[in-house]
Amino acid sequence: MLITKADPMVVSMGPHHPSMHGVLRLIVTLDGENVADCEPVLGYLHRGMEKIAESRTTLQYLPYVTRWDYLATMFTEAITVNAPERLANIQVPKRASYIRMIMLELSRIASHLLWLGPFMADIGAQTPFFYILREREMIYDLFEAATGMRMMHNYFRIGGVAVDLPYGWVDKCLDFCDYFLPKVNEYERLITRNPIFLKRVEGIGVIGREEAINWGLSGPMLRASGVQWDLRKVDRYECYHELDWQVEWQSGGDCFARYLVRIGEMRESVTIIQQALKAIPGGPYENLEARRMASMAQKNSQWNDFEYQFVSKKPSPTFKLPKQEHYVRVEAPKGELGVFLIGDDSMFPWRWKIRPPGFINLQILPQLLIGMKLADIMTILGSIDIIMGEVDR
């Protein structure tokens, strides 16, 4: 006699599951092998990053921000210095802007590589994981030569970067670009037309165009659903508008489309790096002068007066944030990374609100999982690309 179980089964996946990409817990309700409900449990890696910012100067806070998305630390550093720069009207030298752009794109490639390897391992293909570590090591060698650190670089500064590029670094980076492009083609030959891979990703976790916009998705999650939205084109920050490159996008909206977008972005990042390395200008790599509106409380100050402040390179609090508010965003590998900064005419920010892309993108996960098979959970979660350091903050 066949005994059937009518009651649904509740399974707790994580926070110590090897495919969880961090300390994420999913409380999954199963009806046989089908997912009936899913409740993500967050907060295991919450460290109060926004509150810490209120008692630190920007320079003192820089080492903390590399612990948000610890696989793409250049972007968290960029947003941390961009917010005070915009608030205080600090002009970044062109050479510093080009150096930042090169570092950001190298960090984007490293982040996408470390997404590709574990994503394929989750599906069951172990080989690409070892391939991507080989190329990622070369990027970390470039970071170490320029910043002194392989991870947690602490390289960006208000008004520029900490140090100039060392002698021979540009040639070494160009050599890496020439080496890396054929490797991306090799990944595609290994993966893209593999019938087992296609069965696991095609038509899985489909997000429509309107749905992606309504959920506030960003980055590859949004562009894989047919929306050509890239902040490097939209906001024209740094010097991206001076280079020739294309926004990678797909219309499928499934896990396969998100894979194709990230593969294409690695190619475009190499194109950006090659152009930037050949066009990088000379000149200073930092500007330590802040040009802000003079306070009306000062005597003899007119409406068009400017007050010049010196930005110290030491952690000592010499740079005051104006009493204004500003929202700054950059196109991180996982989506729109933003900071809403409120200054209070003091060395410390009054409010430092972080808009992490992984946290917003993760909200759609329960809707994607309902009705899918248990084995598809890892595929869909892996295609979102989350890092719990920035999700929990």
Curated annotation (Swiss-Prot):
It holds the Pfam family Complex1_49kDa. The keyword Hydrolase does not apply. One of its GO terms (cellular component) is chloroplast thylakoid membrane. InterPro entries: NADH_Q_OxRdtase_suD, NADH_UbQ_OxRdtase_49kDa_CS, NDH1_su_D/H, NiFe-Hase_large. GO terms for biological process: photosynthesis, light reaction. Belongs to the complex I 49 kDa subunit family. This is NAD(P)H-quinone oxidoreductase subunit H, chloroplastic. It comes from Zygnema circumcarinatum.
